């Protein structure tokens, strides 16, 4: 099982988001604990030799890295689709 960590940007976004949207996003992110690369995630590139994935959550997107050696999923950024990239 993996541990899900949020970057400061991701935490700040969730703090400003409405409660029902925040709950929906957090529920989807919890699923990454069991399977860090689900079939509905997409590889979008590399940063510092680490793969970056996109996870779709309705109109929102979460960008994240999987750190296999320490079993951590690091959520880099969460935002609406046009702004996340």
Predicted regions and their residues:
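A generic "cationic amphipathic patch" detector
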Residues: 23, 27, 38, 45, ...
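Enriched for short, Lys/Arg-rich terminal
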Residues: 1-8, 12, 20-23, 57-60, ...
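A short, surface-exposed loop/turn module that caps and links secondary-structure elements
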Residues: 30-54
């Amino acid at each position: 099982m993996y541990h899900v960590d949020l970057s400061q940007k991701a935490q700040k976004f969730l703090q400003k988001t409405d409660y029902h949207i925040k709950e929906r996003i957090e529920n989807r992110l919890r699923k990454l604990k069991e399977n860090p690369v689900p079939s509905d995630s997409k590889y979008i590139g590399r940063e510092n030799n680490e793969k970056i994935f996109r996870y779709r959550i309705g109109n929102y997107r979460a960008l994240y890295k999987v750190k296999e050696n320490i079993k951590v999923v690091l959520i880099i950024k969460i935002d609406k689709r046009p702004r996340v990239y």
